[in-house]
Amino acid sequence: MADEINEIREEQEQLAPFDPSKKKKKKKVVIQEPVEDLAESSQTEKSDSLPVNDGLESSFTGMKKKKKKPTESSLLNNESVDAGEDLDEIANDEQEGEEGIVLQQRYPWEGSERDYIYDELLGRVFNILRENNPELAGDRRRTVMRPPQVLREGTKKTVFVNFMDLCKTMHRQPDHVMQYLLAELGTSGSLDGQQRLVVKGRFAPKNFEGILRRYITDYVICLGCKSPDTILSKENRLFFLRCEKCGSQRSVAPIKTGFVARVSRRKT
């Protein structure tokens, strides 16, 4: 009977009106941690509170610190830098050496306070001439003249065989050369059919050679550069000698004939 009464009461309580003011109380659940977990948590809190350096020193008090070896990249960079500096120094030394050699060859007085020597200054002038005008400063071309070939024709005439060849070598007109020869020899002559100069009188080859030397000096050679490449022209009754190399121009004296004895008989 008592059990039935209790069941009825419980049903009545369940069917009772809902009261929102009343709240159910939550039961507090207490979890007990083991002792080992508590010790570990306390150690972590202490380690967090300590600075990093102190923790490392306290943990590794009995051990020595090892020095770190330099990496291979740093070594390679240092070697490349040293090699580059060495190459730059070698290149600079070579350039300085070459410049010093060139200056020493051109100007021996560089780097000293001594007086100039005439031979050194003269060599410098010729070096400048060779650089600017290699034709003028080069070796002079010597004009080689063939010796005159002279033959006797009879007892009163002399034949100049290679007269035309010498005129071509000197680049002069045969009439002008013949006029000078006859004026210097003091005789008369003419060209024959073989283009040989036939002169009246007896003359040795030395006579023709000396006259030709004077003709070359007066009417062929340039007095400035001593070049035989000249042109003889006539302007306003005057002869001018112009050099094709240096461009200088000068007037030359006209050919003067001396006294010529009249050998032919006068007509009566």
Swiss-Prot record:
GO terms for cellular component: cytosol; eukaryotic translation initiation factor 2 complex; plastid. Its main location: cytoplasm. A zinc finger (C4-type) spans 222-246. The keyword RNA-binding does not apply. Phosphorylated at Ser-42, Ser-80 and Ser-112 by CK2. It is found in: Cytoplasm, Cytosol. GO terms for molecular function: translation initiation factor activity; zinc ion binding. Pfam families: eIF-5_eIF-2B (PF01873). Keywords: Acetylation, Cytoplasm, Initiation factor, Metal-binding, Phosphoprotein, Protein biosynthesis, Zinc, Zinc-finger. The modification Phosphoserine is found at S42, S80, S112. Belongs to the eIF-2-beta/eIF-5 family. It comes from the Eukaryota. Gene3D superfamilies: 3.30.30.170. The lineage of its organism: Eukaryota, Viridiplantae, Streptophyta, Embryophyta, Tracheophyta. Transmembrane segments: none annotated. Component of the eIF2 complex that functions in the early steps of protein synthesis by forming a ternary complex with GTP and initiator tRNA. This complex binds to a 40S ribosomal subunit, followed by mRNA binding to form a 43S pre-initiation complex (43S PIC). Junction of the 60S ribosomal subunit to form the 80S initiation complex is preceded by hydrolysis of the GTP bound to eIF2 and release of an eIF2-GDP binary complex. In order for eIF2 to recycle and catalyze another round of initiation, the GDP bound to eIF2 must exchange with GTP by way of a reaction catalyzed by eIF2B. InterPro entries: IF2/IF5, Transl_init_fac_IF2/IF5_dom, Transl_init_fac_IF2/IF5_N, Transl_init_fac_IF2/IF5_Zn-bd. The keyword Chaperone does not apply. The modification N-acetylalanine is found at A2. This is Eukaryotic translation initiation factor 2 subunit beta. Eukaryotic translation initiation factor 2 eIF2 is a heterotrimeric complex composed of an alpha, a beta and a gamma subunit. Residues 1-85 are annotated as: Disordered.
